[in-house]
A protein has these predicted regions:
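N-terminal low-complexity, Ser/Thr- and acidic-residue-enriched intrinsically disordered segments
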Residues: 1-70
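A general "terminal functional-core" signal
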Residues: 1-6, 11-12, 20, 81-372
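Short coil/turn segments at secondary-structure boundaries
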Residues: 33-36, 58, 62, 74, ...
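Charged, often glycine-rich, active-site loop that binds/positions anionic groups
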Residues: 63-88
Length: 372
């Protein structure tokens, strides 16, 4: 059985307009160029997949326009209406640093629709697993506002669609984007039918978001696990976090399907983080998730593209993920790894271990909720 793959030229042409890094053009001393959230890194990932002839090992899942009722499962009507109106004009800002150009609503709806289609095919066993190379990203978006380049919360919408249609009671979302998925956390914070686990650089973005003490409220207590890593963490920290926290959480929860908010911005050369991951880090995390999924939910894993801003490194990080998903016999080496490893991150330091261990409290609450 083949892995599924969603991508479309229209998604890769999603535009955020001119900018200067993450900054809007409000200072006339900053010379404008591309906004940091442009499509180039994702286009280069797609180009690498084509160059290596991996598309033949993937089942292409076509995008479709998400129905407004699907988006309404998560987002408020007035907010959707504003985005649609601005998109039909000349674009605007969805909120908290989320600029977009004309036709953004149409493009975002295509990405959401494609992810929903992919998720359903994975759940029904029509494809082995799935990767959605979609834009714009989603995990920061809240119910009534955009946030951090994200207009709509793609994974939250897809997960909620599956839950409603197939009466699911245990959906896991693993978020390894280097920035905390504040939107996804808030949406599911009071619920136990979705387990949200985020591993992120401490206090990178958003500010003061993603504390290990934020482990959910009411029915959701123990179903929100934030794993913080300090700046300078790398491969060793992520291995430790996965082995000690993520594996135990998934084994206790026994999800019916696993979504991954698949950001590549923990790369050692990403401009929006200070972590030291490389392609083998993403390979390890993918392999771990796939192995657990085989044991817990018949291999049902859906990866959805989030951040990643290094035009050089994102393609190789994404390639490592796809190679594991399709079980490709060849493993292409990461040409950037040596440069990253030279800076550190391969040894777990005591301060890194101590910070990760703060997440055991949330894990233990989850385990106490699932003593079968």
């Amino acid at each position: 059985m083949l892995s599924g793959f969603v991508c479309d030229e229209r998604l890769l042409n999603y535009k955020t307009g001119a900018g200067a890094h993450v900054f809007s053009m409000t200072n006339d001393l900053i010379e404008p160029y591309f906004h940091i959230d442009n499509s180039l890194s994702k286009k280069r990932l797609y180009n690498l997949i084509k160059k290596l002839k991996l598309l033949k090992d993937l089942r292409i899942v076509k995008v479709r326009t998400a129905d407004i009722n699907e988006i309404l499962l998560i987002h408020e009507y007035e907010y959707i209406k504003i985005i649609k109106s601005l998109s039909e004009a000349n674009g605007g800002d969805a909120g908290y640093g989320t600029p977009f150009s004309r036709n953004a609503f149409e493009i975002a709806s295509l990405g959401i629709g494609g992810l929903i289609e992919l998720s359903e095919k994975v759940f029904l066993g029509e494809i082995k697993n799935g990767f959605a190379l979609i834009r714009p990203p989603g995990h920061h978006a809240l119910e009534n506002t955009g946030y951090g380049f994200c207009i709509f919360n793609n994974v939250a919408i897809a997960a909620e669609c599956l839950k409603k249609k197939y009466n699911l009671s245990r959906i896991a979302i693993i978020d390894w984007d280097v920035h905390h998925g504040n939107g996804t956390e808030k949406i599911f914070y009071h619920r136990n039918d979705v387990l949200y686990i985020s591993i992120h650089q401490q206090n990178c973005y958003p500010k003061n978001s993603g504390s290990s003490n934020d482990y959910g409220l009411k029915d959701g207590k123990g179903y929100n696990i934030n794993i913080n890593v300090p700046a300078g963490s790398g491969h060793a920290s992520y291995i430790y976090a996965f082995k000690e926290i993520v594996v135990g959480a998934l084994e206790s929860y026994k999800p019916q399907i696993i979504f991954v908010c698949c950001g590549f911005d923990s790369s050692g050369i990403d401009p929006l983080s200070r972590t030291l991951c490389h392609a083998d880090t993403f390979r390890f995390m993918t392999k771990t998730i796939l192995k657990l999924a085989d044991q817990l939910c018949e291999g049902k894993v859906v990866m959805s593209q989030e951040g990643g801003y290094s035009e050089t490194h994102v393609p190789f990080c994404g390639l490592a993920v796809l190679e594991e998903m399709i079980d490709n016999e060849r493993r292409f080496l990461d040409p950037v790894k040596e440069t990253i490893v030279h800076q550190g991150g391969e040894t777990l330091l005591e301060n890194q271990k101590k910070m990760i261990n703060e997440s055991f409290e949330a894990l233990n609450i989850l385990k106490s909720n699932h003593k079968y």
